[in-house]
Amino acid sequence: MADETKATDAGQRYAQSLFELTIENGSLQKVEADLKSLKAMVADSADLRRLIASPAFSAEDKGKGLTAVAKKAGFQPLTTKFLGLVAANGRTGDLLGAISAFVELSAKHRGVVTAEVVSAAALSPAQLKGVQTALAQALGKTPEVSTRVDPSLLGGLKVRVGSRLFDASLRSKLDSLKFALKRA
């Protein structure tokens, strides 16, 4: 959930359509894995980001580029067709948002909730397991946890689940204390 990409209305519609197709043909998990892999590739490759975002490339060139990447990565045929369709319709600017929306739909379908845990230092496997267990008990759903390190927290955790933020960081406690002392 460290992802800040929001789906546009068009991206949401593409995600919903792809989601329904994957449910029909039973390829939900494979297509989701393909899309997550593509999103990671985009994050790692400036050239791929430029291909998706730049108006200098025609829709045809974008389609050829995305389908070539998909074939080389061994993506499902449905994923490859989806990428070609998005490019052909001139909607590559909506692609990352559509992927985020698709992943959300898939998680909701599986009864999984995504959570982002931000800590001052990297969590050990035992600490991560403890956070997952606590979230599962609090939310009543299986959490899919992503972690991020932010040294400015000084200690403690911040956990974001959907639009809710649980802030148990030392930084926020010190800020609260500072504010209380200024008011006194």
From Swiss-Prot:
Q: Which Pfam families match?
A: OSCP
Q: Where is the signal peptide?
A: none
Q: Which InterPro entries match?
A: ATP_synth_OSCP/delta_N_sf, ATPase_OSCP/dsu
User: What GO molecular function annotations does the UniProt record carry, in alphabetical order?
Assistant: proton-transporting ATP synthase activity, rotational mechanism
Q: Where in the cell is it found?
A: Cell inner membrane
Q: What keywords appear on the UniProt entry?
A: ATP synthesis, Cell inner membrane, Cell membrane, CF(1), Hydrogen ion transport, Ion transport, Membrane, Transport
* Major location category of this protein: membrane
Its record classes its membrane topology as: Peripheral membrane protein
Q: Which SUPFAM superfamilies match?
A: N-terminal domain of the delta subunit of the F1F0-ATP synthase (SSF47928)
The subunit field of the Swiss-Prot or TrEMBL record says: F-type ATPases have 2 components, F(1) - the catalytic core - and F(0) - the membrane proton channel. F(1) has five subunits: alpha(3), beta(3), gamma(1), delta(1), epsilon(1). F(0) has three main subunits: a(1), b(2) and c(10-14). The alpha and beta chains form an alternating ring which encloses part of the gamma chain. F(1) is attached to F(0) by a central stalk formed by the gamma and epsilon chains, while a peripheral stalk is formed by the delta and b chains.
Q: What is this protein called?
A: ATP synthase subunit delta
Originating species? Caulobacter vibrioides (strain NA1000 / CB15N) (Caulobacter crescentus)
Gene encoding this chain?
atpH
